[in-house]
Amino acid sequence: EYAIVQPGCYYRDFEPKTLEKNVIFPSYTASRELCALGGMYGNNCAGEKTLKYGKFNEYILSSKVIFTDGNEYIVEPLNRPQLEEKMKLKTFEGEVYRSVWELIQNNGAEIINAKPIVSKNSAGYAIWNVWNAKTQIFDLNQLLVGSQGTLGIVTEMKIRLVPVEPVTAMMVTFLPDLKNLGELVNICKTVNPTSIESFDDYSLTFAFKFFSDFVKQLGLFGGAQLGLRFIPEVFMMMRTGLPKLILMTEVTGNN
């Protein structure tokens, strides 16, 4: 499944349309009610489901981009013969492909060594993702996504969607201190969770303070449902006091 969108499309308008087809773009951000798809492309966005699904660059299939010569080009993954044809072009587009290819070939070791060893990197200019030596695929989108519009102006995106998976379970863990947090997170990751989120005692106090406002937004029925879901946690806090950190691990699908 995929969708073709323009950069000005707000995610809050986009998601309901995908949900009608029981699919979703999983790399949405916490600010999904405010952001547009163009900003998400430029920022190589990620969010609560990134642990399982990854970032925006893993879902871009092709794009239309205006380069500095003022012309619009289709940017999509190319195999080696297609790349060779692009580099033969006596145009600005051909020069772009020749320059990037030359940069990668002449600095291969440095580029590989410069790649951050992290689970999430949205710093931009991920040139190490452009050429895949194993698959022999060259994808300039991997450089453009996350570049904040500095390398070109995106006018259209073709993005991959994934099936919506129902929430199977959520484990809520109360931590009296942070001593074993790292070890606990690694244990939680063994069940292949969709997300692991946390909030501290200050955030919890803030949530209690404005809980009535949340109920107003959800409505009486929605607020009651939310309250019932967290009855066990409320009793736990009554027994043990306010936790230093609450860790929420969500699993979906067949996990």
Go through each PLM region and give its residues.
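N-terminal glycine-rich flavin-associated loop
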Residues: 1-29, 41, 45-99, 118, ...
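Flexible loop/turn segments at secondary-structure boundaries
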Residues: 11-13, 35-36, 72, 81-83, ...
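Short, acidic, Ser/Thr-enriched surface-loop or helix-capping motifs
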Residues: 36, 67-68, 146
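Conserved phosphate/anionic-ligand binding catalytic regions in large, soluble enzymes, centered on
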Residues: 40-49, 137-161
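Phosphate/pyrophosphate- and phosphate-bearing ligand-binding catalytic cores of soluble enzymes
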Residues: 79-137
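Long hydrophobic segments that form regular secondary structure
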Residues: 122, 130-151, 164, 168-169, ...
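Terminal amphipathic helices with adjacent charged low-complexity linkers/tails
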Residues: 182-185, 189-255
